[in-house]
């Protein structure tokens, strides 16, 4: 095919899903001339699976993206149809916001946001190959022969990467939602020497709302006072739609059991590794055979569509079996299936082939982000896309990459897990993966990351000023409560008795009273007058910081200990073969991962404390040898 020079850019982003849009917006907003290429312009930021954003750990990631200057939180706040805060009865470390999105509004709003950016060119095109010169990525070549040149390239092709859809015995080449897949780029990555693996994910059928008998289901409304994902959002949308809860039953399970021989999950048809934390209904029936029923949530896909997402019923069983099992579920006896559920297999680049900046080790100037790195979920993809976009732009401007620590953000935990440990299955972010989850809360994402966002140019001066004012207000109110003494008046004693708290014998500092589990900031505010107005956001922060002060201090001490290990850098040109005493597995893993610090090396599976001790001694001896010379 004849090729032609189609233009030169600073950064090219291949793909415009949830990773691609964050990568492109970050790069463009940082001043890099950015080209975003996508197979279909109508699929920008499309939600091929569940129409929701957030949830445990994932909701915190959305807040972190926003605190750094990304778009997902803002876009969700503009387009949600339901907002709920989860785990409100638990501690602040596991609270999480989850939105039901209008998937069509979400997509259109995000596309228009990109179109308005001066530094971004959004174009339809299918990338087949990369332009590589002397191990450096210099651009991309499309199937129409267009050659686009750039200083860095970010690949965010997601499940389009050599995608194959499977429904029962039917199997065909396709991206999600029957879109054109990206086949030749995967083949090209293999030619370049990248290790790819087949992963699998799935989606449930969509059904017609007007054929559902909602009287047989349980209503799941949104919060009366919804919270925002973005720290920029001032007004919340109040016109919310409910979701609905129903259950499978033994009849449903019998139909599934009778057709397991036709499910790709249990035949040789399925080659890809599926997501452990998002199992298909077939998998659930087999793995949890003692359970008489499983939850099914009916989630509207938008305000202007009849389509309802059947959450909890992900399946790749044949079409007629899907229809039959749907109609055994209470409320769905006469339901019409509008779209069939399916499994999709796709290529993933094994993420231990990446640096923590998300640049590939094999090809300089080439970054990958999103599901192509072996993750599952829109939020995980968006977090990676943001960091890849930031670092691709910073490489153009000859600046050091931004690498978030495990103590700074869930995004840091996610990327460190991927590049240090790799993954054998689609990776899902969980609160249990974070050692310092009390520090990585939903409520304090801005306090952790706004400084970085402003420094790299994604947070405006105006927003940064508001952030500094909030910080000052929190400190001022904490100081006030630490100085204000509450006397054991009749009014105070009555209030304490009413809520089951012990009465005061002497006076007590307001901050010390707030440390009691049953005492909230609102209760303190009732008995301690305030000269200035304190917003709910500031009140929440003051309460958490005072109430959990001891635990937070303990976590910070652990972080300091870990940072001392992070500060012990491993020389770039280290020869692991020259280190005697390392276990064979440790030697292989260290050579493959090429950790940047002793802390990262210690997190590699197969590298034991004894190996770390040997490595430390070797590095120290190397320093001594250099000094003596």
Swiss-Prot record:
Chain sites annotated for binding FAD: 15-20, 127, 182, 371
Subcellular location: Cytoplasm
GO cellular component terms listed in the entry, alphabetical order: cytosol
Subunit and interaction comment: Homodimer. Heterotetramer of two MnmE and two MnmG subunits.
Biased composition range(s): Basic and acidic residues: 215-226
Protein name: tRNA uridine 5-carboxymethylaminomethyl modification enzyme MnmG
General function of this protein: NAD-binding protein involved in the addition of a carboxymethylaminomethyl (cmnm) group at the wobble position (U34) of certain tRNAs, forming tRNA-cmnm(5)s(2)U34.
Organism classification: Bacteria, Bacillati, Bacillota, Bacilli, Bacillales
Region ranges (Disordered): 203-226
PROSITE patterns recorded: GIDA_1, GIDA_2
Keywords per UniProt: Cytoplasm, FAD, Flavoprotein, NAD, tRNA processing
Single Gene Ontology MF annotation: flavin adenine dinucleotide binding
Species of origin: Listeria monocytogenes serovar 1/2a (strain ATCC BAA-679 / EGD-e)
Binding site for NAD(+): 274-288
Similarity comment text for this entry: Belongs to the MnmG family.
InterPro entries with a match to the protein in the record: FAD/NAD-bd_sf (IPR036188), GIDA_C_N (IPR049312), MnmG (IPR004416), MnmG-rel (IPR002218), MnmG-rel_CS (IPR020595), MnmG_C (IPR026904), MnmG_C_subdom (IPR047001), MnmG_C_subdom_sf (IPR044920)
Pfam families: GIDA, GIDA_C_1st, SAM_GIDA_C
Gene3D superfamilies attached to this UniProt entry: FAD/NAD(P)-binding domain, GidA associated domain, C-terminal subdomain, tRNA uridine 5-carboxymethylaminomethyl modification enzyme MnmG/GidA
A GO BP entry: tRNA methylation
Superkingdom of origin: Bacteria
Co-factor requirement: FAD
